[in-house]
Each structure stands twice: as C-alpha cells, then as structure tokens.
Amino acid sequence: MKLLAILLVLPALCFGQRHEGPGMGPGMGPGMGPGMGPGMGPGMGPGMGPGMGPGQGQGQGQGQGQVGGSKCKGGWFLIGQQCFKMMSRALKWNDAELMCEQNAPCGTPVLGGVMTIPDIQTSNAVINHLKSLSSTAMAIDIPFWTGLHNKWNALLERYEGWKWPAGWSTTQQPLRFVNWAPREPNNQLLDQQHSYCARMNRMGQWYVVRCDEPMYFACSMPVSPPLVGGANTNPGMGMLVENPAPIINGYTEFESGLLMRNGVGGP
C-alpha cells in the first residue's frame, strides 16, 4: 500500500508544483490550443488557464496547444531556438525567475528563466507575438522583465556584470546583442546596495531598473536538447558591442484597466 501511495503522489508533484495555478492575473489573449485533460496547472486552451488578452479563462486543464512548432510543450511556444511561456502575474525579478524555473516542463534538462533575448529576430518575434494575442496591446507601455540582470556581490564588493539567467549552456559567451534605450544602461543608478535588472518597453528597448519592482514577464528556455549557438550571454562586466535602433514602429493597447490595478505603469 505504501508503494502504491508513493506512485500516486509522484505524478502530482511533477505536474502540480510547476504551474501558476488558476486565476493569477489578467488575461491577455485567447487560448492557444485544446486542453488535454484535468491537469494541475493552467492550460492554454479556451477557458483552460490565463490567456494573454481579453480572454479571461480560468481553469486547471493542462493544455497542449503550441505556437511555432512541436519542440515546446505544456503551454510553451517556439520562437527561434527557445521555448517561451507568457505569465499573467506582475512579480519582482527574483520571484519571476523562481516561477519560471518551477514552470519548466517535467524532464527538462535545463531550467527555465525570465526571457532571454539573444538577437533582434527574437526581440521582434516576442513583441509581435504579444500584439497578436490581443487587438489591444502595449499602447500604455506595460513594461516586461527581460532575464538580463546585474547583481551586487556583497562578498566581493562589486557588481557581477550584465548576464542572462544561469539555465543557459552558453553562459560563458560574451553579450553579443543588446537593445538598450538611449542613455542606457544608466550606471548612475547603481548604488552598491541593490541588484538591477533590464525591463523591456513596447519598442523592445531595455531600461535599467531595480529588480525589486513588480512587472509582468515571460519565461524562456532553450529547446530540448539545446541547439548549438543558441543564446548570447555575459558573465563579465557588461561591455556593449552594438545598440540597434528601435525595432517596432506600430503598437496596440493592453487592457489597461486590469493591468494598472496591479501597480504596473509605463516608463
């Protein structure tokens, strides 16, 4: 009997603890595929979990609908060499990172993290995907976390440098792509007491802000198995090698009433 009880509990641990749960924030679009049964986390089917637009489905099915390819599962969709998952909560960066790790599909060899943007194509695709999920998206410039962060190391008494989440296999490569807004990164903000993270605006540009501000976010992880030459990261001191111009000229609006009530505003 004890062995049977253990076997029954293990699947629940795998599928239950890695999902947000129902009703955790405003919807931001229609569901993206039919649910596949009574799962324990939010699905991506109609009414089966928080969407990313006017759709407000609340439920606990674990949908298997997919966008951009079949290499991503459990509500994750493919952009380039990464699987993405849009989350419906505004969290501090560290809490967002933890939620991304917990939401990685079972059996994944690498951790998920707050979204990594290794190139201009990924940046464009992420913004276009946000726009496609709703007829109203981003006009009030709802900020989103990126995974880029610069943490203060109290032991070494220095900043660690701008880098992407540690779940990437190419962590030791330099930062080859940046899309900082004009006059960013603003090093005058760094006060040797707080860690700083990069948030993305509706144009895809990055701004330096303290990591303890709540913002909306998306998770990303390499396709499994990771492809060669995937992410560009930086464990060093954040030397910038390029700064592209703004990448999106048009935009649409978010459902501002719902989002603003969560304390997330523009730049």
Curated annotation (Swiss-Prot):
One of its GO terms (cellular component) is extracellular region. Disulfide bonds join 100-219, 197-211. Sequence repeats lie at residues 21-24, 25-28, 29-32, 33-36, 37-40, 41-44, 45-48, 49-52, 53-56, 57-60, 61-64. It is found in: Secreted. Its main location: secreted. InterPro entries: C-type_lectin-like, C-type_lectin-like/link_sf, C-type_lectin/snaclec_domain, CTDL_fold. It comes from the Eukaryota. Residues 44-68 are annotated as: Disordered. Residues 1-16 form the signal peptide. Keywords: Disulfide bond, Repeat, Secreted, Signal. The keyword Disulfide bond applies. Pfam families: Lectin_C. Residues 79-220 form the C-type lectin domain. Residues 20-64 are annotated as: 11 X 4 AA tandem repeats of G-[PQ]-G-[MQ]. Expressed specifically in the micromere/primary mesenchyme cells (PMC) lineage. Produced uniformly and exclusively by PMCs through the early prism stage and this specificity is further restricted during skeletogenesis to a subpopulation of PMCs associated with the growing tips of the spicules. The repetitive domain may provide a calcite binding matrix. May play a role in the regulation or execution of skeletal growth. This is 27 kDa primary mesenchyme-specific spicule protein. It comes from Strongylocentrotus purpuratus (Purple sea urchin). The gene is PM27.
